[in-house]
Amino acid sequence: MVLSDLGLDLDLEWEASRMACLVARSIGVRDPLDVMHEIKSVVAGKRVYVVGAGPSALKSYMRIESGSCIICADGACSLLTHLGDVIAISVTDLDGGIEPAELVFDRGGYIVIQIHGDNYRSIPHIMDHLRRWRDRVILTTQVHYQCSGLTMIPGFTDGDRAYVLAKALGASEITPIGMDLDSEFSTYLSKNIYGENSPATISKIRKLRWGRRIIGGLYLNYVTTERPGPLGL
């Protein structure tokens, strides 16, 4: 059902995973479980702000509590320039550009990169960045591929993967910002082809809806300060 609804090519996803494994071995990434444990020490028991790349992210004034951390989706990490010293994790497929991930890394954060059928051909062009990041990077794929340098985080957008990561690593409270999973619009934070409030592609809208279902399955500990109602979305 998911494959047909999103138009995913399973063969292409396997090829992307194979490429990701080669990249992981080439740059000598750390065991993703070891890096996850490091991130967990930052996230567990803390309030986590999950910052999506939706239109409302550009209109939100982020007031981040001391001692909390941010998990940002793709280009939404560029919003960190307006904040002070805050711990951040980037969850990205790099559609929003490489600069937001660089910003997170340069501030001492971690980068979780999703390599999939739409972006794997561009990965060889950023090998220098990946080598620099290798001690604080996790490579993830859409399908389970037997490779020690890879792992999986469920989700179809960087935003819902960011939420799943926060939940899995023991955040005490999750506050979403810019998680516009019911929207039919997107921004340049999500992909460079968009403006500040551009109509999203059909594929993007379907991914957002599936992301909403994933987060809905984790609703028991979902906390929002943005809007009332189911999921606060």
Spans of features found by a protein language model:
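N-terminal donor/sugar-recognition subdomains of glycan-related enzymes
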Residues: 1-48, 58-60, 185-187, 193-233
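Acidic/Gly/His-enriched mid-domain segments of enzyme catalytic cores or analogous surface patches
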Residues: 2, 29-30, 42, 67-69, ...
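Short, hydrophobic/glycine-enriched beta-strand segments
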Residues: 47-54, 69-71
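Generic secondary-structure signature for well-ordered alpha-helical cores
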Residues: 132-135, 142, 171-172, 179, ...
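Internal, active-site/partner-interface "lid" segment
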Residues: 143-145, 179, 187-194
